[in-house]
Regions:
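Ubiquitous "structural anchor" signal
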Residues: 16, 62-64, 107-109
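GHKL-family ATPase ATP-binding module
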Residues: 2, 20, 28-31, 35-47, ...
């Protein structure tokens, strides 16, 4: 009844996010090494089908919760972490909450059909308007393949719009291919003539391939790839959790781009990684310029904007604990992640500048060009503003006019004086 609470909106953005919740669970499986192909099909009537080749969602009886796992997953909100077979652990780095995403999307659907291949059976589930119809069907299956296929149609009585544009799928699937190296996403999009157009997204080397694609060989410095894994915590009295990150970075004369991902979610509003990049780059590049004596006497220091103008950076991080600003996962706030990224980027930049002095020289020179051109543009803007302001100033338009003495805006006075 209130999709905005979970999906962030009851409009098309919320409907799109409900798709991402289902996709997330398939990505989690593939990232753990269970299947490397995810098929996504969009039909003209607005229905969507997502099929993975993972282990198949758990359907067996959960003794602890005294319910079947399929009920927890599809019918109970916030069941993520409760479900799971005895021999199937939860994911170390989870994108989907599995139990919030599946269940909330199911409740927001006109219908949902699920087929699960696992343990030598095909399990079938059918839901209508949030209700399971007919329980679960179990059919013996001799094939060796496993996986989950979910087809559903978002409910127009829940969302104000369910016509998800092609651009959404193309953007999301490309981004997921970028941060999930080696996983292939195959999109089939139904056309007006009922045929399907097929699109494939795959980056064997993940963010490194993506950075090279963006730069297209036209870069100031080559792409640098850094990675690390460490234990972090958000506060002294808080527990440690695991963080790993991959960073692709280059400088360009033409392109400026920063993209941050966490547990595969694109962080549209950045948060912790963005703050880390600003702090680390400003500190190290400023030191580089200062130590090489490139600042002129009394010159102002660079700002991050001067670095950003020529910086191409993509960060994909994963953690076992994450503080998102909300369920739409567009920004993270973890202090531990921010501090670790700041330290690691600082360290890698310092080593990079020492080991590649020619690149360091190019970066320092380009950042100073950006800074000085920005300052010149600002001076020109201020001078023009001053000139325009003066020309529009009514007090200076006609000489020898005396300012009004009355504070009453209803009064009007005009004095005409002959002579000087």
């Amino acid at each position: 009844k209130r999709p905005g609470v979970i999906f962030g909106s009851d409009g098309i953005e919320g409907c799109e996010h409900s798709v991402f919740e289902i996709l997330s669970n398939s990505i989690d499986e593939a990232r753990e090494g269970y299947g490397n192909l995810i098929n996504i099909t969009y039909f003209l009537d607005g229905s969507i089908e997502i099929e993975d080749h993972g282990r198949g969602v758990p359907v067996d009886y959960n003794k602890k919760e005294e319910k079947y796992n399929w009920e927890l997953l599809f019918c109970e909100l916030y069941a993520g972490g409760k479900y799971g077979s005895e021999n199937q652990e939860n994911y170390e780095y989870s994108l989907g909450l599995n139990g919030l995403g599946l269940c909330s999307t199911q409740y927001a659907s006109e219908y949902m059909d699920v087929k699960i291949k696992r343990d030598g059976f095909v399990y079938s589930l059918h839901f209508e308007k949030g209700e399971n119809i007919g329980g679960i069907e179990k059919t013996p299956y001799k094939g060796k393949d496993t996986g989950t296929k979910i087809k559903w149609k978002p409910d127009i009585t829940v969302f104000t719009d369910i016509a998800i544009p092609f651009e959404y799928f193309a953007d999301v699937l490309k981004r997921q291919a970028v941060v999930n190296a080696g996983i292939e996403f195959c999109l089939k999009f139904q056309q007006e003539d009922k045929s399907f157009k097929e699109f494939k997204y795959k980056y064997p080397n993940g963010i490194s391939d993506y950075a090279e694609e963006l730069l297209a060989g036209d870069y100031l410095t080559p792409v640098q790839n850094w990675s690390f894994e460490k234990q972090v915590k958000d506060r002294e009295d808080k527990p440690f959790y695991k963080l790993k990150a991959n960073i692709a970075m280059a400088f360009s004369r033409k392109l400026s781009l920063a993209e941050y991902y966490h547990n595969s979610s694109f962080l549209e509003h950045g948060g912790a990684p963005e703050k880390a990049v600003k702090s680390a780059f400003l500190y190290q590049v400023d030191n580089l310029i200062k130590n090489s004596g490139k600042y002129t006497k009394n010159e102002n220091k660079i700002t991050f904007a001067d670095i950003e103008d020529s910086l191409v950076i993509i960060i994909s991080s994963f953690s076992t604990m994450t503080s998102y600003e909300n369920q739409t996962k567009k920004s993270i706030t973890n202090k531990g992640i921010q501090e670790a990224l700041t330290q690691e980027i600082r360290k890698h930049l310092e080593i990079y500048f020492i080991e590649h002095p020619q690149d360091a020289e190019k970066i320092a020179a380009q950042v100073l060009v950006n800074k000085r051109s920005r300052e010149d543009a600002e001076k020109t803007r201020q001078n023009l503003k001053k000139k325009l302001t003066n020309s529009m100033d009514i007090a200076s338009r006609v000489a020898k006019f005396v300012d009004c003495r009355s504070k009453d805006i209803a009064e009007r006075e005009l004095f005409i004086v002959e002579g000087d």
